[in-house]
Amino acid sequence: AHGFKAVASKTKVPSRKDTMVGTVYNQIDKKAYAYISKWNSLEDATFLSDILQANLRVRFSEEDFSIEGNFYAKGTLIILRGDNKTTLEFDKQVTSIANKNSRILNPVQTGFVSSGKDFGSSSVRPINKQKVAVISGKGTSSLSFGEIWHFFDTQLQYPLTAIDTEYFNRVDLHTYDVLIIPNGYYSSILNKKGLEKISEFSKGGGTVIAIGSALRSFADKDGFELKIKKTSASDKEKNNTNLMAYAAKERARANTAITGAIFKSKLDDTHPLAFGYENSYFSLKLNNASYAYLNNGSNVAYFDKSATNIAGFAGQEALKNIPESLLFGEERKGNGSIIYMVDNPLFRSFWDNGKLFFVNAIF
C-alpha cells in the first residue's frame, strides 16, 4: 500500500540503535538562480499544493538532468527566481513552505545543466494552478466521492468544487481545468449529449479523470478510444453456466470474481502521469473489470501477458482476462486529455502508493 522496498528475514534482526528523523531547515540563498525539489512522494505533492496556493510559479522537468554534481529524476520541481520577480520575499516564502512540509531544497546558481535539458528549454514546463471539480450526487459512489474529497481536504489541502449530477448539464465546464468523475453509474448525465460536453471540455484544454466503474460511460462509445477487453469465456461455457445446478453456481461466480487482489503492473516512467515512480507499480484490484490497451493513446500503466495476482483472491476465469489489459491510460483530445484509471488509486485513503498518480493527473 505504501510502496516501500522491503526484504524478508526468517530470523530476528537485531537493532543496535534508534534512528531519529531530523528536522528539515532550508537556508535562504539570495543568490540562487532556482530552488530544486525532488518529486517522489505525497509530501512532495503537498509542498507543490502550498507553493501554487501562495501564487508562486513552479516548473517541472520532463527529463532527467544533472546540475552542480547532483542527479534529478524527471518530474523534479524547479522554482525559478526569474519566474517570480514580482513576488515579495521570494526566498523566504519558498524556504518557509519547504520547511513546513519537511522538503529539502537544493539551491543552484545557474540554469545550465551538466546533462539533460537546461532550465530555459521547452522540456522544463510550467505547472498551472488548476481549478478542480468533482462530480457528486445521484449515480456517484458516495465512498469514491468521499475518498476524493478527503484527499483534497486533509492531505493535498487544495480547493475542490463539487458539481451535483442534478445540475451538471447546466454547468459551464470551461470555468474549470480538471473534472474528476468518481466511481459510479452516469447514464443519466453521460448520455450522447453529456459525452459531447465532456469531449468539448477536453478538446478545449481540460483534463478529465475517470475512475473505476465511471469508465463504462466511455468504453466502446463513438469518439473515445477506451474499449472493454473481450472476455475469454466462450458461448458454450456461458450456456453450460446457465444449465449448472443451483448449488454449484456460487462457486462458479467466485471463479469469475476478483474481490481484492494485488497485481504488479508495468509502467512507462517517461510519461508525466508516472513521474515519481520507477518501472512498476502494485495495484489493488477490487473487481474483474478489464479494458484493452489504448490503440491511439498512452498506456502508462498496464498488465503484461504474465500478470497474475501476487496476493489476495482472484478467480481462475477472472485471472484470464487481466493479462494484456490497461491500468492507467491517457487519451489526448485537442488541447486536453482524458485519464482512464481502471483501479482506484485512492481506495479508502490507505493505498498511499497510488496517490502520486492522482496528483500527476491533476497537475
Segments and roles (model prediction):
Residues 1-363:
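Intrinsic-disorder/low-complexity accessory segments
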